[in-house]
């Protein structure tokens, strides 16, 4: 059973919801001011606060009115510390309340502003008393701007009264740099949380820039009970020092190259491929800047490292496949992910250049985004893996028109297996045909853009182009407008007959008319008749192809070329649409007949494992990116020596003086 107290009803509701989400539904949240009206009193003595085994709290930071209504209701919470918390700051008041309501062997975790670690006056006195009691087991410094409503940096005080008498110090973690930007706030990643937990639980001190066990003497005698994390852990990066000699004479300082030792230890031959020794303290670059990444990828040891990464992932896959291919209702999703995480960390722990916590982040990010839902669906329903044969329509709400508010089907997707995976597995030929047609569309559109961009501003094509685009109907209208006034003997006769088709509406009339007007023979269609459409077609041919005057030739040709490209785009877009529709139907039908083996292969191997490996492979790619970026940075920093820059400056100065003199000015 869990217990809590909250003054604000809204926040109390959130606390209850949070408990349910964490599968702790049995919780009681009472209302009231924790300081002036504590709700949990000892059952045998109503004048004594009830004590608890575990307390977790994230109280309001720096509360200014915490003493309101407190007189006579202190319940001994603030006695024995040498002073009272400041009237305008309730941070230590919360901590003292928690310490009072904690059992003699109880444990607590409290989130408080960083200031509680080092502020002076009354708070310093209280802090010293708490430190001397050895109740603080650990301090975890968190990133700033982590919580909504405040950008203040916070920390977690881990309290453990059990074993306090024999406690030799405080375990400190500086996790202030482990986060990712999320909008205008910072957010702890899964890897950051996991690193904090494992480092604290296992008391890991292999990275002194992240965590240390601080002896009592260092806290009490050396730092006067000041717990500011920066006094004990220096998490800052080493200063990137500029080398004056290298700026003057050139060369990359050996001290900077040695700073990349973690890479050279794994890829020893790569160092000699990229760099040559100038002297004991300086190197030169052997390859051009743009060839560095290619040189790294071609390096045998770099490739071998990639193979080791593949082997580590393959070993993890081999271990997890039997588990992930036999999920049922007896499996706990929570226990499953813990096992998956522990195993992937074990496999990647020996790969020195890839942080095991990065591998953890890849897995946890995919679990939270996709895999958790998949596993939950499989283990929570009797259908299990056969859910993979199901497909679901994608619906969107109609936002306007007479059907506004109704839902319409806009597509479909596999319930467990994305259709992209099914297409890749069974319909590669059809997919290639679609991609080929799409490539033609893209290439044709590119040609059309080039044609528009190359057109003269005064051209007819430029007149119909808008924001670099044209429409076929606008091009056709422009062609008609340009050529409609073109006249020949034939067009004159055709225009006459077009206005009075009765002249040729019978076979006898047609034959008689053609004897006197032989130029009109070109409009007789395949049925032996002259119609309005056959006349219009002939007029179009005459005016746009046969009799275009030289003054209009360039414009008409350009418009016709653009129209041809537009038509090609339209035709192939239709091809793409038809092919997609046919593939969509075949793909959906294929879901229904997936075999059990196909389901496991598509779901476990192609969806889960391939997605996770994609993230792992990004870590491998990042190695070359980081190494390349650093070497280029160093090479460019010392590429131009001071004498060279000085010489270049003198040359430019001479050129400027020469130009000024030619303009009639003198520069002394």
Where are these regions (language model features)?
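Conserved SAM-binding loop of SAM-dependent methyltransferases across substrates and taxa
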Residues: 1
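S-adenosyl-L-methionine
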Residues: 5-49
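A conserved structural/catalytic subdomain of Rossmann-like adenosyl-cofactor enzymes
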Residues: 49-415, 419, 429, 434, ...
């Amino acid at each position: 059973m869990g217990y809590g107290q909250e003054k604000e009803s809204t926040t109390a509701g959130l606390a209850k919801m949070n408990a349910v989400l964490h599968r702790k539904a049995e919780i009681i949240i009472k209302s009231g001011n924790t300081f002036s009206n504590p709700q949990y009193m000892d059952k045998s003595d109503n004048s004594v606060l009830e004590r608890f085994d575990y307390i977790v709290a994230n109280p309001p930071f720096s509360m200014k009115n915490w003493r309101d209504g407190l007189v006579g209701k202190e319940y001994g919470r603030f006695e024995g510390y040498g002073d009272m918390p400041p009237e305008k700051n309730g941070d230590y008041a919360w901590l003292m309340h928690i310490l009072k309501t904690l059992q003699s062997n109880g444990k607590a975790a409290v989130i408080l502003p960083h200031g509680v670690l080092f502020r002076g006056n009354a708070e310093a006195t209280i802090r010293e008393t708490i430190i001397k009691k050895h109740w603080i087991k650990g301090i975890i410094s968190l990133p700033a701007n982590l919580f909504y409503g405040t950008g203040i940096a916070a920390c977690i005080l881990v309290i453990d009264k059990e074993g306090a008498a024999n406690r030799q110090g405080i375990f400190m973690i500086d996790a202030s740099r482990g986060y990712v930007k999320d909008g205008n706030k910072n957010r702890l990643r899964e890897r950051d949380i996991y690193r904090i937990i494992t480092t604290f639980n296992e008391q890991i001190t292999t990275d002194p820039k992240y965590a240390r066990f601080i002896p009592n003497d260092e806290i009490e005698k050396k730092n006067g009970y000041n717990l500011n994390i920066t006094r004990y852990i220096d998490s800052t990066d080493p200063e990137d020092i500029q080398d004056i000699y290298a700026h003057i004479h050139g060369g990359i300082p050996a001290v900077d190259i040695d700073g990349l030792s973690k890479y050279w230890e794994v890829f020893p031959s790569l160092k000699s491929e990229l760099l040559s020794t100038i002297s004991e303290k300086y190197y030169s670059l052997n390859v051009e800047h743009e060839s560095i990444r290619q040189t790294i990828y071609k390096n045998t040891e770099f490739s071998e490292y990639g193979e080791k990464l593949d082997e580590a992932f393959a070993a993890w896959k081999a271990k997890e496949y039997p588990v992930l291919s036999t999920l049922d209702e007896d499996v706990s999703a929570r226990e499953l992910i813990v096992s998956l995480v522990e195993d992937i960390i074990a496999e990647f722990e020996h790969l020195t250049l890839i942080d095991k916590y990065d591998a953890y982040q890849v897995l946890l990010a995919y679990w939270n985004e996709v895999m958790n839902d998949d596993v939950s669906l499989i283990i929570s329903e009797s259908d299990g893996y056969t859910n993979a044969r199901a497909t679901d329509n994608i619906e969107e709400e109609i936002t306007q028109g007479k059907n506004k508010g109704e839902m319409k089907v806009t597509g479909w997707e596999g319930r467990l297996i994305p259709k992209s995976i099914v297409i890749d597995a069974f319909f590669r030929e059809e997919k290639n045909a679609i991609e080929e047609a799409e490539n033609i569309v893209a290439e044709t559109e590119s040609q059309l853009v080039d044609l528009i961009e190359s057109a003269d501003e005064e051209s007819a094509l430029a007149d119909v182009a808008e924001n670099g685009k044209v429409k076929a109907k606008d091009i056709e209208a422009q062609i008609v407008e340009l050529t409609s006034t073109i006249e020949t003997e034939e067009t004159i006769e055709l225009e006459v007959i077009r206005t009075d088709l009765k002249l040729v509406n019978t076979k006898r009339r047609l034959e008689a008319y053609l004897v006197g007007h032989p130029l009109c023979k070109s409009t007789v269609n395949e049925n032996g008749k002259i119609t309005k459409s056959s006349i219009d077609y002939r007029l179009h041919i005459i005016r746009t192809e046969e009799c275009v005057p030289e003054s209009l030739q360039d414009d008409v040709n350009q418009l016709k070329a653009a129209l041809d490209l537009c038509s090609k785009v339209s035709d192939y877009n239709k091809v793409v649409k038809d092919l997609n529709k046919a593939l969509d139907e075949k793909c959906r039908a294929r879901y229904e007949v997936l075999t059990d083996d196909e389901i496991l292969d598509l779901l476990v191997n192609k969806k889960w494992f391939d997605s996770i490996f994609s993230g792992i492979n990004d870590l491998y790619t990042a190695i070359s990116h980081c190494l390349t970026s650093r070497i280029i940075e160093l090479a460019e920093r010392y590429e131009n020596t001071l004498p060279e820059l000085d010489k270049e400056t003198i040359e430019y100065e001479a050129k400027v003086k020469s130009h000024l003199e030619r303009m009639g000015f003198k520069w002394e």
